[in-house]
Every structure is written in C-alpha cells, then in structure tokens.
Design a protein with these regions (language model features):
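Glycoside hydrolase catalytic-domain groove-lining segments
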Residues: 162-165, 179-265
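Charged helix-capping and loop-helix junction motifs
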Residues: 60-68, 234-240, 272-278
Length: 424
C-alpha cells in the first residue's frame, strides 16, 4: 500500500455514552465530532445499539435509522468518513442483544435460521440507508461478536469453526447487498489469534471481508507481564498486524488496526502520550496497514455506573471535550506522519509459526507464549520481524511476494537481546 494511512477514532458520545440513541441530540453529536475533527483525524467508527435499532426480529426502527444517517451526515460535514458497526453486541464489558434472542426466546446467535435472517436484514437495511453517502466507508458486522461464541462468556452460543465461517460470510454478504462496493468487514477480539479451540480463527479474519481487522489491548497480559514501557507493550499492535498476515490469500491484503488504546493502570496516565506515539509509529512500520483507529474519542461520563474502571478514561478527550495527553500525542503524530509519510520497507526476516491451526498453536502466540516472546525478543534486538506459517516457510514464491528473504525458528532466537543494528 502506498497511500497515506488513515487515522481515526472510535466515537464514544459524551452525553449518555451509547445510550445516547435513546435521547438522540444532533447538536451534542456535532459538538463531539467537531472536537474529533480538530485533532486532525479523518474517520470515525460508530456504534448503533442493536436492541434499540431492531427491537423485534421483523422491525428495524425507521426513526433509529434516520438518526444514524443524520450522525453520518454530520460527520461528513466535518470531513470525517464513517464506518458503522452493526451488531452491538458487546461494548466496554456490556452485552446488548435483543429480547428476541434471550430468555424465553433463547436461540443461538450464529446458527438459528430465524435469528440469522433477522441479523442479515438488519445489516442490509443499515447499509442500504447509507449507500448513497460518499463519506460512508462501509459496515463492520459487529464489535467483537466472536465473544458470544465461546469461553469466557458466561452464556456462550457455541458453534464450530465451519459455522462461524458460514455466519461471517452471510453477514458480510448482507452488508454488500445493502451497499455494493463499500468496504465491509468483520471484527474479533484477540481470542481469534490467541485462544486454542476458539471457533473464530485467524483464517476467518484474513480471508472473509474486504480487509483484515485487529484489536490491540495490552491489558491482555502483555503490560502486566512486561511493563508499560517494554518493547512487548509498545509493539503489541504491530505484532498483531504482522500475525494477521500469513493466513491471507493475497500477500498484501490490507490490515486495519481498528481498536487500540492506552488502558490505565496498565499504561499509567503519565505514559499515555508516549505509549500512543510509540504504538502508532510501530504499527505504521508494518507494510499494508490501511489505518489506525484509536479507542476512544471521549471519556465515559463517571455519572454512569458499573463500568470496569479502565473503561472510564480511554478517551483522547475528556467527557467535556478537552484534549488529553494521548489526544495531543496522536494529533501531533498524525500531522507529522501526513507530512513525511513513506511506505515502510518490507520486513525481510520472518519468524516461523508452527501448528497455529491446531492444539497449542494459538496459545503460543499469546502473551507469555513461546512464539509471542520470541517475536518480541527479535523486536527488542532491532529486528523488524514478520510472521510466516511453517507450511509456507519453504515456499520461495510466497516468501518473495511478501518481501521475506530469511526465516527464523523460535528455538533459534537468543533468550537475551544481542543489540546489533536493525535487520529486516
């Protein structure tokens, strides 16, 4: 990719959080989006709440859809393009699923024919309503909907890998039916990359939808294990971007870093700016990155109860729209990168990944796993590592297409960084 990467934010309304759809105020939305645009960002990701938009399986509320269109138009008036998440789904520790899928109407979210037909119609309806808006980027099927399919969810809708793939393809196709030619994709949390046996897989992420999507959160054990300023913490997003690539059928499939944030106390507030700058720069040292979308635009109003503590302060701006250190750091980095952007050179050294689709393979990729730790030792040693599956490590044509000239086995990575000059 030679185009300058996109820089955006996940929009968290200042008044009422995502419950603002119940008391929708376009003036509040406009003020929020003004404060986002002032940071120099170019897009937002927005979140309808599924139960509010589709309270009955055969009812997608026209007024709710009109409000979504008004929000998207307000963003466009401020030079912001918009990605819309459909099935919300899961947000900041809360689940939002409609009553027609729970309790007396309990049905599997991924396999019940009536539920999946209702979901597809909902996604098609939202996409169709926005299809003629030039500032509409496309749909994301939902926010980390994979969380509903397996542990540690308290009430999972269990499915197989094949059923997950079928569901994803159907939902992406529904988005395409509503808005042909836009950028439609799906999003998982890092269980897809790190959890053995999870039904949503790296191959699903890298082969279904218009681009691959990663969400990077260092509260997953990375910062706890390595510390807030360690290579592993500041390179976690870059690692996920590179880990996403080997499964792609196209060697230069775009990868979107769709969520990344500075969660306290794992990243102390006094380090939030430095962490933001390092994370963005490291992510953009990976080839084929479509863009970086920070979580989130504004802090959560502390008058709202029961959020995990770290969720309240993830904003680039405060709840009263004042720029925080992370927001200032991102704005400065964006301005500089737009002026000086050059596509990163290929990562010529790749770490070989064994058994990633089998028992133990994905766990090795997680923080503390043998593959994760070897990759981070290489990164700390000045190498710019890529990732390659064992089955393609001897495929000269595939390696050449990705710009890889050297492959390294995890067992051959020294246990302690040696500090030569940068390689790869």
């Amino acid at each position: 990719m030679t185009a300058t990467p996109r820089f955006g934010v996940n929009y968290t309304p200042t008044r009422g959080w995502f419950h603002h759809w119940l008391d929708f105020d376009l003036d509040d939305v406009r003020a929020d989006l003004d404060s986002v645009a002032e940071l120099g960002l170019d897009h937002v990701r927005v979140f309808p709440l599924w139960p509010l938009f589709q309270p009955n399986r055969t009812l997608v509320r026209p007024r709710a859809v009109e409000q979504l269109v008004a929000l998207v138009d307000a963003a466009g008036e401020r030079g912001l393009e918009v990605n819309v998440d459909g099935l919300q789904g899961h947000l900041s520790s809360f689940d939002f699923v409609p009553s027609w899928t729970t309790t007396w109407h309990r049905r599997n979210l991924f396999t019940d024919p009536e539920v999946t037909a209702g979901q597809a119609e909902y996604l098609r309806t939202l996409a169709q309503a926005l299809a003629d808006r030039p500032h509409f980027l496309g749909m994301t099927v939902g926010n980390e909907t994979n969380q509903f399919s397996s542990d540690p969810h308290p009430d999972p809708d269990r499915i197989t890998e094949a059923e997950a793939a079928e569901w994803l393809r159907r939902m992406v196709a529904a988005c395409e039916a509503g808005a042909p030619g836009r950028t439609h994709l799906h999003a998982s949390d890092d269980a897809a990359w790190y959890a053995d046996g999870h039904p949503f897989t790296p191959a699903h992420a890298a082969r279904i939808g218009a681009m691959t999507n990663v969400h990077s959160w260092v509260f997953n054990g990375t910062a706890q294990r390595h510390g807030p300023s360690a290579t592993a913490t500041e390179q976690h997003a870059a690692y996920l971007i590179e880990l996403a690539k080997p499964w792609a059928e196209e060697p230069h499939r775009p990868v979107w870093l769709q969520e990344v944030g500075a969660p306290a106390p794992h990243v102390p507030p006094e380090r939030a700016g430095a962490f933001t700058t390092a994370t963005v720069r490291n992510a953009l040292d990976c080839p084929d990155v479509w863009g970086v979308t920070w979580w989130s635009s504004h802090d959560v109003d502390r008058s709202l109860a029961d959020f995990p503590e770290l969720e309240y302060d993830l904003g680039l701006l405060t709840n009263d729209r004042r720029v925080k250190p992370a927001g200032a750091a991102l704005a400065e980095a964006v301005a500089e990168l737009r002026q000086s952007w050059r596509p990163p050179r290929a990562r010529t050294t790749a770490l070989v990944l064994h058994g990633a689709d089998g028992s133990g393979g994905r766990a090795a990729c997680a923080p503390g796993g043998a593959y994760f730790e070897a990759w981070m030792r290489l990164a700390a040693d000045g190498v710019r590592p890529a990732c390659v599956l064992a089955e393609e490590a001897a495929d000269a044509e595939r390696l050449a297409a990705r710009g890889i000239s050297e492959v390294v086995e995890p067992r051959d990575v020294p246990p302690t960084p040696q500090r030569p000059g940068p390689r790869g």
